[in-house]
Swiss-Prot record:
Sites where the protein binds ATP: G116, S117, N118, G119, K120, T121, T122
Protein's cellular compartments: Cytoplasm
InterPro entries: Mur-like_cat_sf, Mur_ligase_C, Mur_ligase_C_dom_sf, Mur_ligase_cen, MurD
Reactions the enzyme catalyzes: UDP-N-acetyl-alpha-D-muramoyl-L-alanine + D-glutamate + ATP = UDP-N-acetyl-alpha-D-muramoyl-L-alanyl-D-glutamate + ADP + phosphate + H(+)
Gene: murD
Family: Belongs to the MurCDEF family.
Functional description taken from the UniProt entry: Cell wall formation. Catalyzes the addition of glutamate to the nucleotide precursor UDP-N-acetylmuramoyl-L-alanine (UMA).
Keywords assigned by UniProt, alphabetized: ATP-binding, Cell cycle, Cell division, Cell shape, Cell wall biogenesis/degradation, Cytoplasm, Ligase, Nucleotide-binding, Peptidoglycan synthesis
Protein name: UDP-N-acetylmuramoylalanine--D-glutamate ligase
One GO biological process term: cell wall organization
Coiled coil ranges: none
Enzyme Commission identifier(s): 6.3.2.9
Glycoprotein is among the record's keywords: no
Length: 446
């Protein structure tokens, strides 16, 4: 990697994993950098001081006058570019960037890029495993695992990145070999003024890409700008050329490519209709990147999924308990309910938490159609209750332990108790992992 010597003064805004990766990368490029963080003890501060003692660090409330002294700001994804100090710097002509924008300039291997309200971690992990099985030297990261800039140190002939809308806000042009917006549903409405702004941030993933992978079951997956060289599609019951789809016959539901049957959905270890969609998306991305089909199909068959995503915990007294703690928005929970309703029973849904300003109305129909009861926890329990209405019995719980107990009482043999909160976890838990682990422990202790 060549070293770029520049007189540009760069302020890295926000520390943590991403901020530290920017420090490592830009200092290695010979750039004059400083760091600002609104927190007095941000994560990574000790590592920064030990590794780069000469880098100036500004902690506490952002100072517009300080920011005005830099002609480039590299903003961590957790910080809104609408912050007055950042917006003021931009108005004065400073370039506002993020770590993914830096990565795109430096990467010397093709990029597969994945975003979406739901499923992106599963699809990113699947594509990474498929690439390894096909013999590629692949590095996987971005919004999961390793920050993108740190991947550059390891070398690769293919990068697979999960990207959030926050990361894409500060990415000018990614130039991916293949990119997809898996789906769009209300999320992060506490950061965006409306769904359109959130949608537009997601759409930036397609800038400069060579293959757009489009979900035919979600109109918001389609690129607004038609400047890509090729479209590949996926969706249910769409047996068309250049499309990964499904087809039913006497053997079951087939995943198909054009008119060719690839594998039966019953061969998958993953639960739920939404995971069939995730597999189709991964196959389309891998195909666009030139991966051989057979190793991709073998990975699809053996992949068991990720923790806290429609994860089966146990069956007790004829009732399945499912941990979908990663269902942190309404779209994810709707997909989980509709995918996991048992043939001979109903769903008892445990939901609630910090809704991040979301509209819960889309829950009303699937809850009425698929659920026997609703158990609500957390800050926005009342909002969910009002949105869903009186179609099913509702119970309020002050703790997850009480919620599990109430759900068990409401369940009948053949039912599924589903933790899929449609909300973030921070009002009651450290994060969604903590919420899911507590649910698993409680269920295993019944």
């Amino acid at each position: 990697m060549s070293v770029i010597v520049s007189d540009r003064r760069t302020l890295i805004v926000g520390l943590g994993k991403t901020g530290l990766s920017c420090v490592r990368y830009l200092s290695g490029q010979g750039r004059e950098i400083a760091v600002a963080d609104s927190r007095l003890q941000p994560p990574g501060l000790d590592e920064l001081k030990a590794g780069w003692p000469d880098v100036p660090v500004y902690l506490g409330d952002f100072d517009e006058a300080l920011f005005a002294g830099f002609n480039e700001l590299v903003v961590s994804p957790g910080i809104s570019i609408a912050e007055p100090a950042i917006a003021g710097a931009a108005a004065r002509g400073a370039r506002i960037r993020g770590d993914i924008d830096l990565f795109a300039d430096a990467a010397d291997a093709p990029i597969i890029a994945i975003t979406g309200s739901n499923g992106k971690t599963t699809v990113t992990t699947l594509v990474g495993e498929m690439a390894r099985a096909a013999g590629r030297n692949v590095q996987v990261g971005g919004n999961i695992g390793t920050p993108a800039l740190d991947l550059l140190e390891q070398g690769a002939d293919l990068y697979v990145l999960e990207l959030s809308s926050f990361q894409l806000e500060t990415t000018e042009e990614l130039g991916a070999l293949a990119a997809t917006v898996l789906n769009v549903s209300d999320d992060h409405m506490d950061r965006y003024p409306d769904k359109m702004a959130y949608f537009q941030a997601k759409q930036r993933i397609y800038r400069g890409c060579k293959n757009a992978i489009v979900n035919l079951d979600d109109a918001l997956s389609t690129p607004m700008a038609r400047d890509t060289l090729r479209f590949l599609c996926f969706g249910f019951n769409r047996v068309n050329p250049e499309t990964f789809s499904t087809r039913d016959d006497d053997e079951g539901t087939w995943i198909t490519w054009g008119l060719e049957n690839l594998l039966l959905a019953s061969e998958l270890q993953l639960m739920g209709r939404h995971n069939i969609s995730n597999v189709m998306a991964a196959l389309a991305l891998g195909y666009a990147a030139g991966l051989a089909m057979e190793p991709m199909l073998e990975v699809a068959r053996r992949f068991r999924g990720l923790p806290h995503r429609c994860e089966s915990v146990r069956n007790l007294d004829g009732v399945d308990y499912i941990n979908d703690s990663k269902g942190t928005n309404v779209g994810a929970t709707v997909a989980a309910i509709e995918s996991l309703v048992p043939e001979s029973g109903k769903v008892i849904l445990i939901a609630g938490g910090d809704g991040k300003g979301a509209d819960f109305q889309p829950l009303a129909e699937p809850v009425a159609a698929c659920c026997r009861a609703l158990v609500l926890i957390g800050r926005d329990a009342g909002k969910i209750s009002r949105a869903v209405g009186a179609s099913v019995p509702q119970h309020r719980a002050t703790s997850l332990q009480e919620a599990v107990s109430l759900a068990r009482q409401a369940a009948e043999p053949g039912d599924r108790v589903l933790l899929s909160p449609a909300c973030a976890s921070f009002d009651m838990f450290r994060d969604y992992n903590d919420r899911g682990e507590q649910f698993r422990t409680l269920v295993e202790g019944l």
